Design a protein with these regions (language model features):
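Membrane-helix interfacial "entry" motifs
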Residues: 14, 37, 60-65, 98, ...
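Juxtamembrane/interface alpha-helical elements of multi-pass membrane proteins
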Residues: 70-188
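Alpha-helical transmembrane segments and their membrane-interface exit regions
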Residues: 51-61, 75-79
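Membrane-interface helix-boundary signature
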Residues: 44, 63, 70, 106-109, ...
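Transmembrane helix-loop junctions in multipass membrane proteins, especially transporters and channels
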Residues: 41, 45, 60-64, 88-97, ...
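Transmembrane alpha-helix interface motif
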Residues: 1-42, 48-57, 143-153, 157-160, ...
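Alpha-helical transmembrane segments and their helix-start/interface "positive-inside/aromatic belt" motifs
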Residues: 25, 64-75, 250
Length: 269
């Protein structure tokens, strides 16, 4: 299960999506999320799903990597679907009414839409991290949040912290897997027993994991100090961010997506 968590990983490539400016990809992620929450019917959901599918195909990221990253979310998706099925009250007679629990057609439709929305939302986030290196992501975030410097917001530090946290997710997952394998070799059992027994079994994992995380953080801080890192003031960049033609074309496609979903919502198509 731990090995299926792929958030924060970067897959090097030379596709159009990889070569987009990181600011473009961040803005397009926001645009896509807005379009996703504006979608209210089958046609609009099909449109945003097709848009993401085409983007994944263009990026040359294997679809199995996206699907593998979804495995740890199965319980959340099932829980979300069940809640919407049983707690949505519709009009007319229920489809099923057993022991006081009624299931309406509206509940089934809402459950499908909510699960699909979560899947598309997570998949679009995966696509961003898969096609954007942590350094590029940091530069893009810092550039987009640059206006906040006028109100003394530590933009560079915030973007750096977010990207380091994202980058360390795969590292901590790998470390957790190693610790679990070592504990299993010593006879630890993480699968049987009650919930309390499973919770107690996690203690031998969490303690060395926290120690490892602090050690890695200290090593990272030492490495940054040795390279004379002193924050974002006066820093120059090896690769300057510049918008290119395909970035503006991508913005135009994003605007068309928002407009199309808005039209579908207004006219109920």
């Amino acid at each position: 299960m731990l090995k299926d968590i792929t958030l924060g990983q970067y897959f090097p490539g030379n596709s159009v999506v990889h070569r987009l400016d990181p600011r473009t990809k961040l803005v397009m992620l926001v645009v896509y999320i807005v379009a996703l929450f504006m979608a209210t019917n089958v046609v609009s959901y099909a449109l945003v799903a097709a848009f993401l599918f085409v983007a994944i195909k263009i990026s040359t990221i294997p679809m199995k990597s996206i699907v593998r990253g979804m495995k740890p979310l199965v319980l959340i998706l099932v829980f979300t679907g069940v809640l919407n099925i049983f707690f949505t009250v519709g009009e007319g007679d229920p489809l099923v009414d057993l022991w006081g629990v009624a299931i309406y057609k509206e509940g089934l439709i809402r459950a499908v839409f909510m699960v699909l929305r979560i899947l598309l939302l997570i998949s679009s986030t995966f696509l961003l991290t898969y096609t954007t290196s942590p350094i590029s992501l940091t530069d893009g975030l810092e550039s987009l949040m640059a206006p906040l410097k006028k109100i003394h917001v530590p933009v560079h530090e915030l973007s750096m912290m977010m990207c380091i946290a994202l980058r360390f997710i795969p590292t901590l997952i790998e470390e957790t897997d190693k610790i679990m394998c070592a504990q299993k070799a010593r006879g630890a059992d993480f699968e049987s027993g009650s919930i309390m027994d499973k919770a107690k079994a996690l203690v031998p994992i969490l303690v060395p994991l926290f120690i490892s995380a602090f050690r890695r953080a200290d090593e990272l801080a030492t490495a940054m100090e040795c390279r004379c890192y002193q924050g974002g003031d006066g820093r120059t960049k090896m690769k300057l961010l510049r918008y290119k033609l395909w970035d503006f074309e991508t913005f135009a496609i994003g605007a068309l997506l928002i407009a199309a979903v808005a039209v579908l919502k207004v006219y109920g198509l």
